[in-house]
Swiss-Prot record:
Gene designation per UniProt: MDM12
Protein name (database record): Mitochondrial distribution and morphology protein 12
Residue runs in coiled coils: none
Organism, as annotated: Candida albicans (strain WO-1)
Molecular-function GO terms, alphabetical: lipid binding
Family according to the record: Belongs to the MDM12 family.
Lineage, broadest ranks: Eukaryota, Fungi, Dikarya, Ascomycota, Saccharomycotina
Length: 427
């Protein structure tokens, strides 16, 4: 399932471009710069005119972590309290109107309620036992459903390829759907079981042995809470972007020999040809939209329906390539920016300065990738609050009403010929 994005609506107004530019500029100012550069600033950002290709891969309930957002939780609690108050009020009115109730009826009902409570507690204990059995299946649930390639060299593929059980349909309960069953067809298993130290990434999260011996990851299955709304929805989408977005930066290149800051040379850097191919989640709940990137898509995965070939690593020039054919290197679960090109504007200088320019380019690309990963890669996300638009509309309507009332008050007591009331004229 796919859909078209009206990308022009994002580029007509320059507000979005300006906001993203200010955000990136602030993020770059917060990082520690190496000794050979200074005064790093983002001077321009443009989304471009080419939209990404977005394909819906899964539809279900939003992740529980999105409900932990303070604004969302506060709004939901307020709505729940209002509904409870209304329910109690209606329930109380019904009791007062019913003359058939007496003390004996109430006592009998209390006894029945106690019996019902005991039955409910027994049922809840049974449900909790069943629920506990599924806790460790948060990420790995559905691993046996995967159809791995027998000849695959991926460690995780070998560990599950021997399963003789026939594939089963995915769970009907959306909250029980696993990351693994959703993301497997897009090359995620290529990073499962990888070695090397690192942070909490799917390299560890999607490893079954890791789950059985370590603390459960943050992503966990929880029972549906009262603050969930039936209209809440989450899309797991595949984003493939090869557009004309560009970022312009200005930085001073420093030569610290024979003394610190001996030469300061301004350099303009143009970042273009950005390639993004990732799986992301888009959740809509309580008039708020959440966006978070989950993992990169491996275009070389044999089950992935793509003819794209992995380009070889380039040498020289200003093209920075993140692809690596060395499986022994510990790969982060997500880069978001898979490929990028940097063009430098600099005058004629000595060769040692040009070598430093390459260092600057590599540093900036790494920092850009880190910023995106820290801000919009799971377990981080961005939240777009749609309630702000409603508040602005209400304020505008209120101002219009106040203006109309003010005009009426100004005209009150005046006649068409400009005379005041008779009492005032008499005085």
């Amino acid at each position: 399932m796919s859909f078209d994005i009206n990308w022009n609506q994002l580029t007509i107004d320059d507000t979005i471009n300006q906001s993203i530019k200010e955000f990136l500029d602030q993020q770059f100012k917060n990082i520690s710069l190496p000794s050979f550069i200074s005064n790093l600033a983002v001077t321009d950002f443009n989304l471009g005119e080419i939209p990404p290709e977005v394909t819906i891969r899964h539809i279900g309930d939003p992740f529980e972590e999105f409900y932990e957002d303070e604004n969302i939780l506060g709004a939901m609690n307020e709505a729940n309290n209002d509904s409870k108050d209304e329910h109690l009020k209606n329930h109380g009115d019904g009791i007062n109107k019913d003359s058939g109730y007496n003390s004996q009826n109430l006592d009998d009902e209390d006894e029945d309620d106690e019996d019902d409570d005991e039955d409910d507690e027994d049922e809840e204990e049974e449900d909790e036992d069943d629920y506990d059995d599924h806790d460790l299946g948060t990420i790995n649930e559905g691993i046996s459903l995967l159809n791995f390639n027998e000849n695959s060299t991926t460690p995780s593929a070998n560990s599950f390829a021997g399963s003789a059980a026939p594939p089963l349909p995915p769970p009907l309960n959306p909250s029980r759907d696993s990351f693994h069953s959703i993301l497997h067809p897009y090359g995620v298993n290529s990073i499962i079981g990888a070695t090397g130290a690192g942070s909490e990434t799917p390299t560890n999260i999607l490893n079954q042995n890791y789950l059985s011996s370590r603390v459960l990851p943050k992503i966990s299955v929880k029972q549906k809470q009262p603050h969930h709304d039936d209209n809440d929805i989450q899309l797991i989408v595949e984003i493939n972007y090869k557009g004309d977005m560009h970022i312009n930066l200005l930085v001073n290149l420093l030569v610290n020999y024979p003394s610190p800051n001996f030469i300061s040379l301004p350099i303009k850097l143009h970042i273009t040809d950005i390639v993004i191919h990732s799986i992301a989640t888009i959740a809509y709940l309580k008039k708020s939209v959440f966006l978070s990137f989950l993992c990169d898509v491996d275009d070389t995965f044999p089950d992935f329906d793509s003819n794209v070939q992995t380009p070889t690593s380039t040498t020289g020039g200003n093209f920075v390539d993140y692809y690596s054919n060395d499986a022994t290197i510990n790969k982060e679960r997500i880069d978001i920016v898979k490929k990028i090109k940097i063009e430098s504007e600099i005058g004629e200088v000595e060769n040692n300065i040009l070598r430093n320019v390459g260092k600057v380019e590599k540093f900036l690309v790494e920092q850009l990738r880190n910023i995106l990963r820290d801000e919009i890669a799971w377990p981080s996300w961005i939240c777009i609050d749609m309630n702000d638009d409603d508040d602005e509309e209400e304020e505008e309507e209120s101002e219009d009403n106040d203006g109309g009332n003010s005009d009426l008050n100004d005209n009150d007591g005046k006649h068409g010929d400009g005379r005041t009331d008779e009492t005032e004229a008499g005085e």
